[in-house]
Regions:
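Short, surface-exposed beta-strand-loop junctions and turns on beta-sheet-rich folds
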Residues: 45, 56, 127-129, 194
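A short, charged
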Residues: 74-78, 82-86, 90-93, 144-161, ...
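Carbohydrate-binding surface patches
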Residues: 118-123
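Rossmann-like S-adenosyl-L-methionine
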Residues: 173-317
Length: 317
């Protein structure tokens, strides 16, 4: 087992159970991509077992802080099973949910979402890439499902020195799926949609917005950066008379319109604008248009620190 020795004073974050080891924290040592290494303090004290990534500024990601823990296939299988069992404790009003959330579940760089009878996984670190086959088999074993689609096409893969990969990892099936959540349904495309296909993390926000619309009797709603219309449908389900939805993606808007129709709403209750949000808002101001509620969830403007200044200007625009 190869050992990575940290610089003096760089052990504190690991001692607080932060799972990342940056390039600048390492005094000496190296390994192949995804290889399990021992992380020691400058004084030689064991800190963690981690997956090494020679191409990334996050040079290693911790698997375990227990010196007695073996990082092997059994460890991977147990971690996957534990994550999925944890979700079974919650009464989630949807057939779509996140089963594994990377570092939070002890599987750094792994994202797994479930859409009905289909799993979608993103492998975004060298460590989980190395254990991909074991992870795939463990996922099917733990869920009893047979279909697993890989969406390892995130830009973060390049930071790990990994190529983009997209396609069926286990089984075959349709990439156009139906997501059921709360009282509505939504079309989801797991091959070309954002993230693994949809923003499952906003499920409860959509329900809350629906409840607000009903309780506060929203008439006119504006949904900016609407993507495939999740909040548009939520507003209509809450009784909104009309929703204006703006996005710069034609395919996303087409799916948003399909989602409105899927839930039984007349097309005249929704307007879809293929346009720039900031420019549209300026036009609305000039026209004196107003809305009872506005959903404003812009995309990521600052992927790195280098983009921070430009992002700050964009948020104020």
């Amino acid at each position: 087992m190869k050992t990575i020795r940290l610089r003096q004073g760089k052990e504190r974050s690991l001692q607080r159970r932060h799972p990342w080891i940056f390039e600048s924290a390492i005094a000496r040592g190296g390994a192949d991509a995804g290889e399990t290494v021992r992380i020691d303090s400058f004084a030689g004290q064991f800190l963690a077992w981690a997956a090494f990534s020679p191409a990334s500024k996050i040079r290693a990601r911790a698997w375990s802080f227990d010196e007695k823990q073996r990082i092997d296939a059994a460890f991977i299988v147990a971690a996957v099973a534990s994550s999925i069992r944890a979700r079974s404790r919650f009464d989630i009003k949807s057939n779509g949910l996140r089963l594994i959330h990377g570092e939070s579940d002890g599987l750094p760089g792994l994202i797994v979402d479930r859409y009905g009878d289909t799993l979608v996984a993103q492998f975004t670190s060298a460590g989980v890439e190395r254990w991909k086959d074991e992870i795939a088999d463990a996922l099917l074993q733990a869920t009893g499902l047979t279909k697993l689609y890989e969406r390892s096409d995130a830009s973060s893969r390049a930071l790990e020195g990994l190529p983009e990969v997209k396609g069926w990892l286990r089984g075959q099936g349709d990439v156009d799926l139906l997501l059921a959540e709360h009282d509505w349904q939504l079309h989801v495309n797991i091959a070309d949609g954002h993230k693994t296909g949809f923003y499952l993390d906003q499920r409860d926000s959509r329900k809350r917005f629906c409840d607000y619309a009903r309780r506060l009797k929203f008439e006119r709603v504006l949904n900016c950066y609407c993507y495939t219309g999740g909040f548009t449908v939520a507003a209509l389900m809450g009784g909104a008379a009309h929703v204006t939805s703006i996005d710069s993606s034609g395919p996303a808007l087409a799916l948003a319109a399909a989602n409105v129709a899927l839930n039984g709403f007349a097309p005249e209750r929704a307007t879809f604008m293929d346009a720039d949000v900031n420019a549209s808002l300026r036009v609305f101001i000039e026209q004196g248009r107003s809305f009872d509620a506005i959903v404003l969830d812009p995309p990521k403007f600052a992927p790195t620190v280098a983009h921070a200044e430009r992002a700050a200007r964009a948020y104020k625009d």
